[in-house]
Amino acid sequence: MCCRFYIKENDPDFAPILEGAEKSALFPRVQKAHPAPLVRAGEARPMDVTAVLAMDKQQKPALFPMIWGVTTPGRKIPIINARSESAAEKPLFHEAWEKHRCIIPASWYFEWQHLPSEDGRSSVKTKYAIQPKDANITYLCGLYRIENGLPVFVILTKEATEELVHIHDRMPLILPKKAIRYWINPEIKPTELLPYAVSDYIAEKAEE
């Protein structure tokens, strides 16, 4: 799964991404309606506003401020992840899977490894920062929809790679930079891109 990701401070590669989201016509509306400011650096958490890449009304790639978490009737906690293996079959995500796919740029994402304590009565958590090898930006795949006039998104997950499964059995669906323009294109079937998911990662212990 994925419940936190990180944006490096003063990263020149991220500057145009943040600038693009701030220039979006949606930016004033999101800032007025949602209490959280756009995450420009540091950890991004559920219900935060982050810069997201998606198609605009003219079907051209554009950056938007979006809120992390989809709400559903009768559920107090927002949904932040969706399984890439089954999202297309879920009524909540079927349309977004076909037409409203997005990319959430991050420096890396966080995952927690849970191991039993020495006495076996509790678990010991270890936090890891994970990112693709030889990549400065991690392109997380997501789905978005409009709720109350505001764009919200979930991050898609998949089975963890062999090198990461000891940390957690799930991980975000991440594509290489060359594939992201195809992911957000509604004319392309998303299943055609799943085999191109990044497979080589760096995982380092991180501070809580």
Task: Show where each model-derived region lies.
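Short linear sequence motif anchored by a di-proline
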Residues: 1-208
